[in-house]
């Protein structure tokens, strides 16, 4: 289970794990099939069951990234639990046949582990912490250095204030690394 805010690298880590598992002979394909749970909103239960089954078949020989990291899912009361139950049913029919990496937003890790009876194969939880102000500044500096650019003292001062406002609250820090990369790209394009 990988937990953390958006743009913290959960998908990247899943792809690295897939390549490692392929190199070790655990899986035949070093591929990750990314299954966004939000696309199931509004489906009838049999359609949702079929959708999960198709995702498992497509990921066969590789890894299924079961991605619950979407703000849309917060609005659908009980949806996560129903989808998890469908996934557990599919896994119970073919025990040991699938490798699933479960990605969820920060502070929701207790959800899937709550069904320990059916989730005994989940042994590791990796938490992706939000970036600090210093780490976000490093992301910006590295991006600018790739383009052989440097910030002036004034620019660094403005960016320090901007980054401070990004991490001021948990809501604001959500996807801050993605935003920092976008800001860096805008600076590069406009200079």
Please provide the spans of the model-predicted regions:
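Walker A/P-loop
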Residues: 1-30, 54-57
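Short glycine-rich substrate-engagement loop in P-loop NTPases that contacts/grips substrate
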Residues: 29-59, 81
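A short helix-turn-beta junction within AAA+ P-loop NTPase domains corresponding to the substrate/partner-engaging
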Residues: 112-130
